[in-house]
Curated annotation (Swiss-Prot):
Family recorded in the similarity comment: Belongs to the cytochrome P450 family.
This protein's pathway: Phenylpropanoid metabolism; trans-4-coumarate biosynthesis; trans-4-coumarate from trans-cinnamate: step 1/1
Residues where (E)-cinnamate binds: 213-218, 302
Alphabetized UniProt keyword annotations: Heme, Iron, Membrane, Metal-binding, Monooxygenase, Oxidoreductase, Transmembrane, Transmembrane helix
Enzyme Commission (EC) number: 1.14.14.91
Cofactor: heme
Catalytic reactions of this protein: (E)-cinnamate + reduced [NADPH--hemoprotein reductase] + O2 = (E)-4-coumarate + oxidized [NADPH--hemoprotein reductase] + H2O + H(+)
Name by which UniProt lists this protein: Trans-cinnamate 4-monooxygenase
Pfam families the UniProt entry points to: p450
Organism name: Sorghum bicolor (Sorghum)
Length: 501
């Protein structure tokens, strides 16, 4: 470490602490802030609570400090809400006031300081991007046009697993094949293209670039430079890696996909996929070319991996609950007929399959804190003052796993959505269960995720008995929480024993 730089940073910290205290006493606005642990000057609560602000740690803090509490993370205020009533206030009632997204040094790089849709502030740019993305990505028409492709990709997964001699014996890490399926599901929508196999060089390049992007943005390593700007020089190497990765990813998107669609459109004049719609919006001057690339960035980050995590969690729970797996198979055989593959239109006739999807999203929520919200101006919440540009976290996982609000929430029990919770849906009609958020900044990808998860789990259970590897009673479902995610820590080996056709 550069000792001169460290000395300057420490002196800067001391000076900032003295100045902050003096300014606060002389001119500071008096706020009635939410409760929370007392913090130290400059660093606030950072050294007390550490970097790992995952959903379970925040649940523990809520039990100590209440339904709404404040953490001071350096110069940033972080407000956490943990009840359905407060979630409704943030996401719906005051959806405009708390409808922006927080900014940090890493996401500013990956989104061009908010030129995308998912991570931009609430305003005209967000409204424009949401409108432009909705028609080609997030409508019932899109589902109707693409569902045959999703069903085909699920069929190919089943075929490939059947062909693999390891699958029925020692088992396979089925996630790897499902990852190819998810890329194909989304790249069919985006670019009217697909990858032929897991060995496809372009697929592997994309997969590696997206994985590195997730690692860099999900890591807690950069928090100190984000929380305490005077320490940001120590992040120089980290931020340079982010810039380099962004450049390489954007070049792959541009050279291999966007330009290819431009060539096809020039030849045919037809609009066949989402990117054609997006490029038409660029041609009309509604967005610029950077916006086009950031839309591709959003879909790669916000649609592919998150849905894959949910499928992986669903498989893990079905393996560990063979009676539930058998009950699902019986439902499909009874409703569809033995050997009849489940399709997207069938899902509404399969309530137990729908309940399994919802129970997976409840217990193993992929984005347990949702995407953080922010208020651009001073606001009020539960009678407390919320200073402008506070980061607002809704602990959606805790809302869906609070024993005060759910019967035996730590159990994987799909029957709850057919019995005491039969009116609860994933789109947020009950603020105890908001896996995709609610309101203006909710995730529009719900319209794609639910059928893809349902088709995939249904096809696998129709064709295989899903089992743990030899010598194991269950597979490990330890969580690996990130800043914005909840993944399974170890990608499990699954024995896929073919069923009689």
């Amino acid at each position: 470490m550069d000792l001169v730089l460290l000395e300057k940073a420490l002196l800067g910290l001391f000076a900032a602490a003295v100045l902050a205290v003096a300014v606060a006493k002389l001119t500071g606005k008096r706020y009635r802030l939410p409760p929370g642990p007392a913090g130290a000057p400059v660093v606030g609560n950072w050294l007390q609570v550490g970097d790992d602000l995952n959903h379970r740690n925040l649940m523990s803090l809520a039990k100590r400090f209440g339904d709404i509490f404040l953490l001071r993370m350096g110069v940033r205020n972080l407000v956490v809400v943990s009840t359905p009533e407060l979630a409704k206030e943030v996401l719906h009632t005051q959806g405009v006031e708390f409808g922006s997204r927080t900014r940090n040094v890493v996401f500013d790089i990956f989104t061009g300081k908010g030129q995308d849709m998912v991570f931009t502030v609430y305003g005209d740019h967000w409204r424009k991007m949401r409108r432009i993305m909705t028609v080609p990505f997030f409508t019932n028409k899109v589902v109707a046009q693409n569902r045959v492709g999703w069903e085909e990709e699920a069929r190919l997964v089943v075929e490939d697993v059947r062909k693999d001699p390891r699958a029925a014996a020692e088992g396979v890490v089925i996630r790897r094949r499902l990852q190819l399926m998810m890329y194909n599901d989304m790249f069919r929508i985006m670019f009217d293209t697909r990858f032929e196999s897991e060995q496809d060089p372009l697929f592997n390049k994309l997969k590696a670039l997206n994985a590195e992007r997730s690692r860099l943005s999900q890591s807690f390593e950069y928090n100190y430079g984000d929380f305490i700007p005077v320490l940001r020089p120590f992040l120089r190497g980290y931020l340079n890696r982010c810039h380099d990765l962004k450049t390489r990813r954007m070049k792959v998107f541009e050279d291999n996909f966007v330009q290819e669609r431009k060539k096809v459109m020039a030849q045919t004049g037809e609009i066949r996929c989402a990117m054609d719609h997006i490029l038409e919006a660029e041609r009309k001057g509604e967005i610029n070319h950077d916006n086009v690339l950031y839309i591709v960035e959003n879909i790669n980050v916000a649609a592919i991996e998150t849905t894959l995590w949910s499928i992986e969690w669903g498989i893990a729970e079905l393996v560990n609950h063979p009676a539930i797996q058998s009950k699902l198979r019986e439902e499909m055989d009874s409703v569809l007929g033995a050997g009849v593959p489940v399709t997207e239109p069938d899902l509404e006739r399969l309530p137990y399959l729908q309940a399994i999807v919802k129970e997976t999203l409840r217990l193993r929520m992929a984005i347990p804190l949702l995407v953080p919200h922010m208020n651009l101006n001073d606001g009020k919440l539960a009678g407390y003052d919320i200073p402008a540009e506070s980061k607002i976290l809704v602990n959606a996982w805790f809302l869906a796993n609070d024993p005060k609000r759910w019967v035996r929430p730590d159990e994987f029990r799909p029957e709850r959505f057919l019995e005491e919770e039969k009116t609860v849906e994933a789109h947020g009609n009950d603020f105890r269960f908001v896996p995709f958020g609610v309101g203006r900044r909710s995730c529009p990808g719900i319209i794609l995720a639910l059928p893809i998860i349902g088709i995939t789990l249904g096809r696998l259970v129709q064709n295989f008995q899903l089992l743990p590897p030899p010598g194991q009673d269950k597979i490990d479902t330890t969580e690996k929480p990130g800043q914005f995610s909840n993944q399974i820590a170890k990608h499990a080996t699954i024995v896929c024993k073919p069923l009689e056709a």
